[in-house]
Regions:
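Membrane-embedded alpha-helical bundles that constitute the cytochrome b-like, heme-associated redox core
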Residues: 1-189
Length: 189
């Protein structure tokens, strides 16, 4: 969590997302989209894009341990109380926000990382002699890809819904690294 930037009327800017995290996020989005829509699963390009995704996930895991505070997993590990508080605020239409990841956002991050690890592992397994042509590996890969696609759609919908609810342009924050928070929004830890 960086220092607040100069104030604008009714808004306060906070530097949150570091360049690596933003580059990771958008690179992962592009590569996932490429493999889901544009590459043929039987082609070498699909395999190499999958390796690139696996490498990005490995880097993110390291960055989650050694990166700046807002990137560290320990800084946004959700508790049942924080999840309940966020859901209560949402149900009561209270404007609140988190400078870093919200508890529900953190759950989605962990879900996507775990799912992409599973996709990468099963994808790699399908390239080996030991698992080539084994039906359960292929089926698990397909199930995980479908789950990832559902999760990505839910993530995008939640980002736009939360942006509208809180008045914070979350896509802009992930592009610039700066969250512009309305002064009327309560910031939760």
């Amino acid at each position: 969590m960086g220092p607040a930037l100069p104030r604008r009327p009714d808004m306060t800017d906070h530097r949150i997302w570091d360049p690596f995290l933003r580059l990771f996020h958008w690179s992962l989005a592009i590569l996932f989209l490429a493999n889901a829509i544009f590459t043929d699963p039987d082609e070498t390009l699909h395999e190499w894009v999958g390796y690139a995704i696996a490498a990005l996930i490995a880097l993110r895991l390291v960055w989650g341990l050694i990166g700046p505070r807002s990137a560290r997993f320990a800084s946004f590990m959700p508790s049942s109380n924080s999840i309940r508080a966020q859901l209560t605020d949402m149900a009561a239409a209270r404007k609140s926000a988190h400078l870093g990841h919200s508890p529900l956002g953190a759950l989605m991050i962990f879900n996507l990382i775990a799912t992409l690890i599973g996709i990468s592992a099963t994808g790699y397994m399908m390239t080996t002699n030991a698992f080539w042509g084994i039906k359960w590996v292929e089926e698990m890969h397909e199930v995980l890809v479908t789950w990832a696609e559902i999760s990505v759609v839910a993530h995008i919908a939640a980002v736009f819904w939360e942006s509208r609810r809180s008045g914070i342009n979350l896509p802009r924050a992930m592009l610039t690294g700066v969250k512009r928070v309305p002064d009327t929004v309560r910031l939760d830890p």
